Design a protein with these regions (language model features):
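Surface-exposed loop/turn elements that mediate protein-protein interactions on large endomembrane-trafficking
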Residues: 9-37, 73-93, 119-145, 171-204
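Short beta-strand elements that form the blades of beta-propeller/WD-repeat-like
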Residues: 1-10, 52-70, 103, 107-119, ...
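Repeated polar recognition positions within modular binding domains
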Residues: 6-8, 71-73, 98-100, 124, ...
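N-terminal hydrophobic targeting segments
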Residues: 111-118, 125-129, 139-152, 157, ...
């Protein structure tokens, strides 16, 4: 994602010319407004109010398409030839910050929040949800209940989705006059795509 004509666009870097171009295949497009297929908008900044809606976060590539999250909560798909841009589904609720991460497998996207409830003193439920990439199906595939916890570092290998559970507590550093988060990874888990079941793979701190 880069700045082009005073807004942000999905860009392609040409290794031969060493230049960037908007990923837009529209005929006669001027690449300077929201009608452009490469249009992203203004990336979110904590220090200013903006009217856009794309997160300053990861760009995902899966099966010849590029995916981004926007601050309206949508997963948005861009074709790599610039011919289309489409909103697939609302996959999370945006509240000013987002730890939302994605893992793609078998035409589904698995969505989790790596911030979760880290540092909270009350018990809460962390989830992994999946959405079909045609936007027609949504379901919660995993729930973890814990205190001050979050699901993190999810990776897809073979027929399993592996992830860690991170827990954190907050403490006050009186000398530095600041609050410190103390976190650790607790056990490795795996979700089986075929059976829909999950369990611990490795016990204890990692």
């Amino acid at each position: 994602i880069g700045k082009w004509n005073n807004a942000f666009f999905l860009l392609f870097f040409d290794k031969d010319t060493k230049e960037c171009y908007p990923v837009c295949g529209k005929a006669d497009c001027t690449h300077d407004n929201m009608e452009c297929n490469a249009y992203v908008g203004y990336q979110y900044s904590k220090n200013r109010q903006t009217t856009t809606y794309y997160l300053d976060s990861a760009v995902y590539y899966y099966k010849d398409n590029v995916y981004l999250l926007d601050t309206n909560g949508y997963l948005v798909r861009f074709s790599t030839d610039g011919s289309t841009r489409e909103k697939i589904a609302v996959v999370y609720a945006y509240g000013g910050e987002s730890g939302t991460n994605l893992v793609f497998h078998d035409d589904y996207v698995y969505v989790y929040n790596l911030l979760g409830h880290l540092g909270n003193e009350e018990e809460a439920v962390e989830t992994i949800k999946r959405y079909s990439l045609d936007g027609k199906k949504e379901e919660t595939v995993l729930e973890y209940t814990g205190t001050g916890a979050a699901i993190t570092r999810a990776k897809s290998y073979g027929e399993r989705l592996y992830f860690l559970i991170e827990t954190a507590t907050m403490s006050k550093d009186e000398k530095a006059n600041k609050v410190i988060m103390n976190s650790r990874y607790n056990s490795l888990y795996a979700y089986d795509y075929k059976t829909g079941t999950a369990g611990k793979v490795l016990e204890g701190s990692i």
